[in-house]
C-alpha cells in the first residue's frame, strides 16, 4: 500500500526541542530563526526530519505482500506528502499530494515549502505594520474553515480504499492554543480522514495531554512529545485495519480495530512441527519479474477469521517463508490488546488462520464518489449516532491472502503467509521434485560407489538370447583362428591360455557391439520401485526419477492438493449460501442452512475409483449421485455399448445415465433438426398479421368438410355442423372485435405494409361479393398470427383501397375492377394462384371447365384449401402447400359434389 503523509501545523510552530536540532543538519529554510520578531516556521524542518527517518528505516529485505494473481505483480511502494499550516491570520495548504523521492537530496516538495514560508513571513510583516483594528476584522473561524475546505480537497484526491495508508501529524503551538469553536471545521475534516480513510492521527507537542485532550479523544489520536516526532511514522507497516470474527449461528460479528501488519526481515524458516512428508529445500524464486505487467492491489479493510488449525495437519507445501508481524496502531483499545495477547500465546503447534481479501486491477481505480467530502458533509448533516463507512465496490480480480497467526516467543505475534489452494498447481509440485533431486545429487554420488541405475537393464529372455549369440560368435572366432593358423602353416593345436584369451577378447568386443546396437533400456515402473527399495537398504539416496520420490500414493502432493481444493470449494459454497460472507466455522455450533443445490463429490470418494496410476479401477460407469430424496438406481450389468444395441422396447424400461434423452422411436433427432432449420428461416418482421376492422365472411357450407390433411391421412372428416358452429363463433368474435376497433381507433387512411398477408377474406362494404385474399407471390410469405390476437395497432398488409365501400352501380364496379387490374395486391395474387391451383388439380381428375360440376367442385375445393391455409404458421413454401392441400382433398370434394348432383 502507498503511504500518504499529511503535516498539519497550527499556531506559531516553534519546536526547538526536536525540529530545530534536526534542522541543523539540513538546509536553512527560515531566514528568521533566532530572532524574536520572526517565527521559527518549521514545516520544511519537519519534512526533512521525517524524510531522513523514513529513509533510514526502509529495509529492502523486509517482507512485503507478494503477487497473488498470475495477471501481474504489484508495483513498488510510493510515498506522498502534503502540508497544511496556519500561523496567525495566514494559512497555506498543498494543492495536491507530492511524491517523496528518497534518492534525491532536494525535491519539489522542498521548493514548495520554501516558497510558502517566504510568503508566510511576508504576510506576518504586513500584519505587524497594520493597526490592531484591521487585524481584529479578520475572523479565525473563517481561516480554519478555509483550511478545512483545503483538507477536504486533499481527501478527495486520495485513491480508492485499500490502496493507501494515511498518516496525519498535527503540530500544535505551546502558547495560546486555538479555541474549540474556531478550529471545529478543521477537526471535522480530519475526522473525515480518520473514519472513512482509516487515517492514523498523531498529535505532537509539549503539554499536549492537557491542551489537546478533547481533540485527541474525538480523533482517536496518539499524543507524543516533540522528541518522539522522528518515530511517529513506521515505514514497516504494510496494512492497517481490523480483525473480524463472525459467528454464523447467531449472525453476530465481533470486530477488533487498530491492527496492522508489518514487514519483517527474512529469517530461517522452522518447520519442525509441520507435516514434512514432501518438504524440500526452499526454492529461490526467479528475480526476473519484468516479464509480468504491473498491477494494483486493493486490500480489504479487515482480517477475517477462518478457523483454528493444527500445524501437523497442514502440508508443508502450503507454508511460505514470508512472515509479517501483527501489531497495534493504538494501544488504547483494550479489546484489541487482549486479542493480541491471546493470539501471541498460541504455541508453535497450533495457529489461527485468517484471510485478507484483495482485489487486483490492471488500471488505477479513480477515487470513489461515496467517500467524497460532499457525501461526508451530507452524512454529518443527518447527525448519525455512530459513523459508518459507506460500501465501496472495487472492481477487479478477487483474490486473498491466507495468514497463519502465532506467537513468536517474544510476546509478539507473527503472521506466516499460507499458499491458497488456487496457488498450488503443477508448477509447484514440479519445482518441489526438482529441488529435492538437486539437493540430493552430491550425496548420492558420495554415498554410493557406483550407479546401478546407469547399468543396462535386460529381461531374462534377452540375456539368454545374448548368451546364445555370444556362443555362436565365439565358435566363429575359434574357427577363423584355426583357419588362419592352418594357412600360416602353424600347428592347429591351441593352448589353454591362447584359447582363454581368444574367448575373453571375443566376448569383450561382442558386448561392446551389443551395447552400442541396443540402447540402455528405461526402467519400468515396478522395476524402478524394486530397485529403489534395494537402494534404500544401503543408503538413503533418492533416485533420479520424479516418479520414485513418493512410493506411497497417499503421500503424493497432488492428493493433498486435491483434497484441500475440494474442501476449499465446499467452504466457498457455504460462504456463498450463508448470509455472512468470508466467515469462519461456527464458534458455538453448526448452523443448519439451506441445502446446496450443487452436489459436491468428496475427494476421498473420488479417489476410490482410480488406481495409483491415475487409471480407473474398472469400466467407466456413471457415479450414482443422489441429488434428492429419491435415489436413481441404475440397471445392473448395463454399459453404454450394451445400451446402444438394445431395441427401443427394452431400452425404455432400463435405468441408465442419460437414457431419458435418447429414447427415440420416431427419429426425434432428425425431426428436431428439421424443425430447428425451419424455425431459423422465420423472419421476425414477417411473422406479424393484421388486425382488420372488417368482419370475417362465412363461406356457404352445407356439407361435411374434409379436414386439412397435410401431415395426416385424408380419411378423418369432422362433422359439418361442428365446423359450421366453429365458423359462426369465429365470425361473431371478429364482429365484436371490429366494433371495438372502430371505437378505440378512429378511421384513418391505412398504408400498405411490407409485412405478411392474411388469408382471411375481405368484404367490400355493401357488396355480397367476396374478394378472397391469399398470401404470397413466392414461398417467402410470412407467418400470419391467429385472428384472436390482442387489440394492438399492427400495420395492415391488406390494401384497403380495394376494400372500400362502393355503390351498387356499374360505374363504381367498373372503377374497382380497373383499379384491381392496374395494381394487384398480394392477397389478391394469392387468391388467384390458389384458384389456378384448384383448376389444375380438378383437371388432373378429369373435371375441366366444361364439366357441369366444375363450378361447384372449384368453389368447394377452394374454400377447403383456403380454410386450411389460413392456419399456417409460416408462408414459406406456400405454393407447395396449396398444391398439396388441393390434391389431398380433391377426391373427397369431387365424390361429394357428384353424389349430391346425382341425388337431384
From Swiss-Prot:
InterPro entries: MTBP, MTBP_C, MTBP_central, MTBP_N. GO terms for biological process: negative regulation of cell population proliferation; negative regulation of mitotic nuclear division; protein localization to kinetochore; regulation of protein ubiquitination; traversing start control point of mitotic cell cycle. Keywords: Cell cycle, Growth arrest, Phosphoprotein, Ubl conjugation pathway. Residues 812-830 have a biased composition (Basic and acidic residues). Residues 521-904 are annotated as: Interaction with MDM2. One of its GO terms (cellular component) is chromatin. The modification Phosphoserine is found at residues 597, 639, 703, 707. Coiled coil: none annotated. Residues 19-38, 754-784, 800-830 are annotated as: Disordered. Inhibits cell migration in vitro and suppresses the invasive behavior of tumor cells. May play a role in MDM2-dependent p53/TP53 homeostasis in unstressed cells. Inhibits autoubiquitination of MDM2, thereby enhancing MDM2 stability. This promotes MDM2-mediated ubiquitination of p53/TP53 and its subsequent degradation. PANTHER family: MDM2-BINDING PROTEIN. Belongs to the MTBP family. Interacts with MDM2. This is Mdm2-binding protein.
